[in-house]
From Swiss-Prot:
The modification ADP-ribosylasparagine is found at N39. The modification Cysteine methyl ester is found at C189. This is Ras-related C3 botulinum toxin substrate 2. The lineage of its organism: Eukaryota, Metazoa, Chordata, Craniata, Vertebrata. It comes from Homo sapiens (Human). The keyword Cytoplasm applies. InterPro entries: P-loop_NTPase, Small_GTP-bd, Small_GTPase, Small_GTPase_Rho.
Length: 192
């Protein structure tokens, strides 16, 4: 059975840990959400192929900037996450996360993931953003950023409602099993 290492990165509080907990337990976490979810390994079937999917959470806070790259070696696919209701986290994909991932792993496939999809149409959330002269990130904006960073796919999901959640991980597996021909064949990430 093929083993796939999937590492999840993005700003603090964009919902990386909730994404992983919701996917692996089929339940949105209650009050307590840890900073970092323990590494998790699951046997899953995608396109009738059995795969051992290893999920690695990371802490997005700056305090972890030196430690985080230690989880990057041998990564098969990255999920770079931003919150659809946090324009700052969207900008940081370009400013921080894409450069960091590419520095350590020049050819590992990336899936860009917009989280908190359930809040994009939430009146209170929209109102709070409006007060700061901001708005939620739209699907076309997400697609444009995905193209800019040469992401394999752009997907949106909600860990709360689970809408689009399984697709994120299925597509992460497909990005490894069915690599796009334009990418270099050597994908494993190594620490230099």
């Amino acid at each position: 059975m093929q083993a796939i290492k999937c590492v999840v990165v993005g700003d603090g509080a964009v919902g990386k840990t909730c994404l992983l907990i919701s996917y692996t337990t089929n339940a949105f976490p209650g009050e307590y959400i840890p900073t970092v979810f323990d590494n998790y390994s699951a046997n899953v079937m995608v396109d009738s192929k059995p795969v051992n999917l290893g999920l690695w959470d990371t802490a997005g806070q700056e305090d972890y900037d030196r430690l985080r790259p230690l989880s990057y070696p041998q990564t098969d696919v990255f999920l770079i996450c931003f919150s659809l209701v946090s324009p700052a986290s969207y900008e940081n994909v370009r400013a921080k996360w894409f450069p960091e991932v590419r520095h350590h792993c020049p050819s590992t496939p990336i899936i860009l993931v917009g989280t908190k999809l359930d809040l994009r149409d939430d009146k209170d959330t929209i109102e709070k953003l409006k007060e700061k002269k901001l708005a939620p990130i739209t699907y076309p904006q997400g697609l444009a950023l995905a193209k800019e960073i040469d992401s394999v796919k752009y997907l949106e999901c909600s860990a709360l409602t689970q809408r689009g959640l399984k697709t994120v991980f299925d597509e992460a597996i497909r990005a490894v099993l069915c690599p796009q021909p334009t990418r270099q064949q050597k994908r494993a990430c190594s620490l230099l």
